[in-house]
Amino acid sequence: MNESKGAVDSGLMSGKTERTTLKLSDKLKLSSSIQQNTKFALNKSITTVEVRKSKKRRDIDNIEQASVVLQNDNVYQSDGDNNTLTIQEQISRMNALQNANIHEKKEEVSDDQTDKKEEVTNAETVGLLPVEENVNTDLVIEEGHSEKVEEVIEESVIEDQPNLEHLDVIEEKNGPNQSGDQNVDNSIVDLLQSKAVEEKKLKKYEKEHEEKKGNPKKGVSNHMYSKHVKLVIEEELEDNNKQIIQTHKTRKNRSVSSIKNKITRKVLIPKKITVQELASNMSERVKDVQNMLFQMGRRDIKPNDFLDSDQAAIIVEAFNHTFKLVNDGKLEDDLYSDGNDKELLPRAPVVTVMGHVDHGKTSLLDAIRESNVADGEFKGITQHIGAYQIILDGDKRITFIDTPGHEAFTAMRACGTNVTDIVVLVVAADDGIMPQTIESINHVKAANVAMIVAVNKIDKHDANLDKITNSLLNHGVVAESLGGDVIVVPVSAKEKINLDQLKSSILLMAELLELKAIYNTRASGVVIESKIDKNCGVVATLIVQKGTLKSGDIIVVGHNSYGKVRNMFNSDGRSQKVAIPSMPVKVLGLNNVPNSGSSFIVVDSEKQARELINYRQELFNASLEENAKSKMDASNILACDVVDELNVILKCDVMGSVEAICYSISKITHEDIKLNVLYKGVGNVTKSDVLLAETSNSIILAFNVKADAQVKELAKQRCVEINHYSVIYDIIDDVKRILSSMLKPLQQEVQVGALAIRKVFSSGNAGSVLGCYVTSGVVKKGSLVKLIRNNTIIHEGKIKVLRRFKDDVKEVSSGFECGILLDYSKEIYPESDIINVLEVIEEVRVIK
């Protein structure tokens, strides 16, 4: 026994938490839930409270006293079974031990609480209090008094936990609360309640034991009762452990919720912001914001409805957040003015090739680039705008922009002149000055850029260079040969004649212009072309005008598109990490297809990108509303009749084609019919397009895009017309044809005969029966007639019955008599009345 006591003392002094000498696990086990709860608290602990040394010494004294009891019990055991303690003596001893433990526990909890308050400040502390289960293990009588007393010592050690030197404290972010004091009270109350429950169980067991002792049953032993009591005790332990864990989880969830509710955010508020955006910026639910607006009197508010800055500020303050009013216009100005004070460095010239359709612009570029783009164009006509960069000797670079020459691509040519430094005007030597040539000259003058004239196809026998220069003079373009400043270079793209001279002229012009740009700043530039690729998504061709564009930058394009640059490719299709000024690149990563000619700029973050997009979208919507209002006012002034409408859904391969076709068909106007483009977009025809066309009674115009088999089948079922085109000429001509078929023909009345009235046979409600003589032309049954008296039309009608003698006939020629029936019941005067026979001729109208 002394060896056991020494082992206990050494274990306590060394700080170990396990007592293999006392065999705790043999009699009473902590439930798995308590162990998990303890591990959870230890892992999440923030601060550590050391157990006072006085407490450790007191616990050692308690164990020593228990050891003395153990020694005394062993004395009883040595005397034999006749000296075994009675049940009443065991109950009295256990009650005394429990009362002592309760008194000691109160002092320990009070001391621990004092230490916690001194060590942990401004934090909520939750102590890992040992589970108090005053189990009367004396009742587990299996092998004698020695084992019963051993269980008493084991329970005392578990309750007091003398070797637990570190109690972990969970710090909650909401600050201290009243859980510390409450835990102390709850621990004592639980201990007292547990004691009362166990006393009742002991009394019940004592009564049953006395009854069994007085009338014992065969086969029933004390061992069976001990197992029963042990099972009841373990069930009570498990229930209490579950309750403790549930209380801890509830307290944790409540703590996390309160922390979240107390987070204060700084919200940026523009001039206008939607309800959904405001809720997102505050990290609040949209429903909560709607409820707040409902209380303010805003009923039927939707997530996409706009709020002004004043309303948004009130909402932010109501949710205990702070706000800052921002001017997005100033933000955009600051972005574009960033880096203007940095050093300017030379850059490559941007050259736009312009001219009339089929004058050899793309072929000339192919000859310069030594490529073959023209053969890839349908029917040799450029349908898209393209950007390329070539490297000459000495690492000199020239960026070329190829624009379509068809009249429909006016917007593209205007876009080309806005980003260019030099314009190469291509004029065919055999055709001379053409309409799009004149238009290109006007664009150059409006943009105030330098121009070089390239007279192409000089290898033809009918080429006349002097005629070209004189024709240019009529449009204000004076060649150097005539004393002007415009360089005229005769070239042949087919035979590659004078191409080096054209390159040299471009480089010379670039040196005279002293083209420079800032490299070390945020990138900005212009969109040349954009489209949707089935493999890559949105692809936009950009030209950097300022700064350096890098892969990974976040850019804002126009009023509807932004994104992170996932990848860039140069004009040769190679991956590009950076793009410097004057370099054209294809960019992947935008969320929407931007319009050609839209500007782009690099921003710091996606949040800033969304703010800038919202501001630009607000301006764009305001302009649309203004235009719609002006159109409505104009229609009210005209007060025109309702006209027929042709609804169109336009799908193209690139955004430039969309704009060009919209521009072209907008010029097709007629007073009796109206053309509406309900939807325009980039990409293949989809099922949504077909359903929209069915609902709106529209036709689908597909330019250089396809429709898969499922879409075609759906269109056939819904009777939706899908027209495919590859050349812009065809789509414009087809739209004119469709519009012409919708026009009502013009009706014109032509006199084809005349009748002289010889006799009136009868006149009444059924009509008038007249005997007539055909003086001219031919009279047919059902012909339109006019009854004229003194040069005044008194009746218009049709010939119901036409007869010769008694026979019905279809027509009567000039010089013959006939009888007719008119639906006219008033009096007719044969002497003065005449009848003119008319025929209605319809004239089909065609939109040109």
UniProtKB/Swiss-Prot annotation:
Domain tr-type G: 346-516
Chain residue ranges for the region called G3: 402-405
Residue ranges, annotated region (G1): 355-362
Region annotated G5, chain positions: 492-494
Keyword RNA-binding among record annotations: no
Xref: InterPro entries: EF-G-like_DII, IF2_II, IF2_N, P-loop_NTPase, Small_GTP-bd, T_Tr_GTP-bd_dom, TF_IF2_bacterial-like, TIF_IF2
Main subcellular localisation: cytoplasm
Binding sites annotated in the UniProt record for GTP: 355-362, 402-406, 456-459
Region G2: start-end pairs: 380-384
Region spans: G4: 456-459
GO cellular component labels: cytoplasm
GO molecular function: GTP binding; GTPase activity; translation initiation factor activity
Subcellular location: Cytoplasm
Ranges for region Disordered: 1-20
SUPFAM superfamilies according to UniProt: Initiation factor IF2/eIF5b, domain 3 (SSF52156), P-loop containing nucleoside triphosphate hydrolases (SSF52540), Translation proteins (SSF50447)
Keywords noted in UniProt: Cytoplasm, GTP-binding, Initiation factor, Nucleotide-binding, Protein biosynthesis
Keyword Nucleotide-binding: yes
Family membership noted in the UniProt record: Belongs to the TRAFAC class translation factor GTPase superfamily. Classic translation factor GTPase family. IF-2 subfamily.
Cited function: One of the essential components for the initiation of protein synthesis. Protects formylmethionyl-tRNA from spontaneous hydrolysis and promotes its binding to the 30S ribosomal subunits. Also involved in the hydrolysis of GTP during the formation of the 70S ribosomal complex.
Name of the protein in its database record: Translation initiation factor IF-2
Organism: Ehrlichia canis (strain Jake)
Protein's gene: infB
